[in-house]
């Protein structure tokens, strides 16, 4: 897992470390990006974070559970005040997203200062219309 984080951190620094950079991360890719951010200064570019995985999630109705590697690291870093969030980030998560856990993502955003938009009645796969609008906005900034 650490080798993937290191690869993301290296690629960000090597190829995308400027204010005009635009990065889009989704789900587990967001998880890797956020872990890479722990090793870096605040990312200077624009980041669109679509339903991020930030740690453990449970779905009580189906008894499903998702437990990624280093599941407590991001929340602990945020709580300890050592997570340096990207300078220009926006996070979007569906209100019915059990994989990301919208309540946890909102809490993480509040602790770190990253703005989080909860998309009503959507799950982990945000609608094409919603994501399309976000991409248009993100890529034309």
Q: PLM features: residue spans?
A:
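Active-site catalytic motif of lipid deacylating hydrolases and related acyltransferases
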Residues: 1-19, 123-124
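Gly/Ala-rich beta-loop-alpha elbow adjacent to hydrolase catalytic centers
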Residues: 24-34
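Active-site nucleophile loop of the alpha/beta-hydrolase fold
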Residues: 48-57
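Active-site nucleophile elbow and catalytic-triad environment of alpha/beta-hydrolase enzymes
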Residues: 62-82
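Short beta-strand/loop motif that positions the catalytic acidic residue
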Residues: 85-86, 91-93
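Acidic beta-to-alpha connecting loop that harbors the catalytic carboxylate
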Residues: 95-97, 120-123
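Conserved alpha/beta-hydrolase "acid-adjacent" motif
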Residues: 98-104, 127
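Catalytic histidine-centered segment of alpha/beta-hydrolase-like enzymes
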Residues: 122-133
């Amino acid at each position: 897992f650490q080798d993937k984080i290191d690869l993301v951190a290296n690629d960000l620094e090597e190829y995308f470390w400027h204010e005009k950079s635009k990065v889009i991360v989704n789900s587990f890719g967001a998880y890797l990006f956020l872990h890479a951010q722990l090793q870096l200064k605040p990312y200077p570019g624009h980041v669109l974070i679509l339903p991020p995985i930030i740690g453990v999630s449970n779905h009580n109705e189906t008894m499903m559970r998702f437990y990624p590697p280093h599941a407590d690291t991001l929340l602990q870093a945020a709580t300890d005040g050592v997570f340096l969030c990207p300078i220009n980030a926006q996070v979007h998560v569906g209100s019915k997203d059990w994989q990301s856990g919208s309540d946890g993502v909102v809490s993480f955003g509040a602790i770190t200062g990253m703005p989080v938009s909860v998309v009503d009645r959507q799950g982990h796969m945000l609608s094409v219309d919603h994501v399309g609008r976000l991409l248009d906005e993100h890529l034309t900034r």
